[in-house]
Amino acid sequence: TKAVISEIFSKEFPDVRLSSFSECDDFYEYIGKSIIFQSKQATSGIIQECLDSTLIIAFVYDNYVYVFMYGDGFIIYNHKIDGLNLISTEFEGNAPFYLSYLSNINLLDSYKDFAFKYPEMKTLTINYFQMDLDPNKKKDIKCKFNHPIIQKIPIKDLSLLMIASDGIASFTDHKNESIDLQQLIRDITSIKSKSGEFIQRKMLNKILPQLTAENILNYDDVSIGAFLFDEEANG
């Protein structure tokens, strides 16, 4: 983790000191706070509610992929042995704990007070689905609302890793019923051409036109990013 701080974030966060962090959780907290405070300065004069959004960071270092999630969203990865895996985070009451609350003491205190009075409404749930091994079974982990959401996966085990906003689960049909999310993920992660902006090309040229033709629309913004790992590079 200390090497990650030095190698990956030295340019963006030049004041980071290696001795300041002994655990990945500490790094997670530092990076989150640094980003939101810099964003607040950059958006001075703009309505601050624009910063109430999920942030997902994925980076590769030392043969591992690290994913830091702040808010709600999805991590999807194709394991070479176990197949497709889906990790989702959700907050009871549809009230994610956004980084922006850390830059506003009043919002932070209000969120903490509400979480103290109604803990069942501010529980973070991390859901694990092994889509290929057992698609109907999931493992739920209940956490406090501010629990660090961190994934660390060896590159050698991966052929693909994707991060996505919760909008990927917002597609509904003409009856206003949610479509099969796992099937949608299988369609998106079925990558034939790996050149250029392959995710954008896949979504804009194939997935979205096909869904629209079937009267299936999304009611929330969809953001997706992905890593594809070369078989030879992974050994």
Predicted regions and their residues:
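Catalytic core of PPM/PP2C metal-dependent serine/threonine phosphatase domains
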Residues: 12-76, 108-155, 216-219
